[in-house]
């Protein structure tokens, strides 16, 4: 789950946006500028990223769910891959308004998608070619819109967002519902309202991969720790029972 300063440098995490686009609220996290490009202070970014991973690990250990969000072109495949590896829901295409605040309606769409997939597996020979085409188009649209959250039965316990400026609606919905936010914030956006800020480049695919991999690793590690704790607890109970029986025999 560890990430080094060198890895951040190699991924280009320190490269911000052009100075003319900067958000003054990011001033505490900016080291300086070079060739009119802001340089993000990795001495700030690294410990803040570690804090975010620690939170993700603890939440996962407590059986919490983290929704991973990254719909920018350079983030889509990375987010989907890492979320699948970690076994958590994700949004990689577009954020549907009300995905959180109107989750009841979204659950209806999820139910529809699952029913259609079951119908597809059973075979579509009973309907006409035209109906099959309409069916195919609908299921493709549902897969694109909500495929990544089809196993999310309730609201997430936290959200990880790459590029807070690009996902303003998702952030507003999370804040409205009091859902904690982990967010990658570049030099041109505001960190205000983000619970776990990761100051860094949100455009480089290498940087995006570093963030997503780190959060996914933290989730997996937290889950593994939880399983180990359960195994230890069960083993301890078994040992206690054995001792009691032995004492009774004496």
From Swiss-Prot:
Keyword Cell inner membrane: no
Disulfide pairings: none
Listed GO CC annotations: cytosolic small ribosomal subunit
UniProt signal peptide: none
Biological processes per GO annotation: translation
Family: Belongs to the universal ribosomal protein uS2 family.
Protein name: Small ribosomal subunit protein uS2
Taxonomy of the source species: Bacteria, Pseudomonadati, Pseudomonadota, Betaproteobacteria, Burkholderiales
């Amino acid at each position: 789950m560890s990430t080094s300063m060198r890895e951040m440098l190699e991924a280009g995490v320190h490269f911000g946006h052009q100075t003319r686009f900067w958000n003054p609220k990011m001033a505490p996290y900016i080291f300086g500028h070079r060739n009119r490009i802001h340089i993000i202070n990795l001495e700030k970014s690294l410990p803040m990223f570690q804090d975010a991973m620690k939170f993700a690990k603890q939440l996962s250990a407590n059986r919490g769910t983290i929704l991973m969000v990254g719909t920018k072109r350079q983030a889509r495949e990375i987010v989907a891959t890492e979320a699948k590896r970690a076994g958590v829901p994700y949004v990689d295409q577009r954020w549907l308004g009300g995905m959180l605040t109107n989750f009841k309606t979204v659950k209806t769409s999820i139910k529809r998608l699952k029913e259609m997939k079951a119908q597809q597996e059973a075979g579509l020979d009973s309907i006409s070619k035209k109906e099959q085409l309409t069916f195919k188009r609908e299921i493709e649209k549902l897969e694109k819109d909500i495929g990544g959250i089809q196993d999310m039965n309730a609201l997430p316990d936290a959200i990880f967002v790459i590029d807070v400026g690009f996902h303003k609606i998702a952030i507003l919905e999370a804040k409205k519902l009091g859902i904690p936010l982990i967010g990658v914030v570049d030099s041109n956006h505001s960190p205000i309202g983000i619970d776990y800020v990761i100051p860094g480049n949100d455009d480089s695919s290498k940087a995006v991969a570093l963030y997503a991999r780190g959060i996914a690793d933290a989730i997996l590690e937290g889950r593994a720790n939880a399983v180990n704790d359960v195994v230890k607890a069960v083993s301890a109970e078994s040992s206690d029972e054995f001792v009691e029986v032995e004492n009774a025999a004496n």
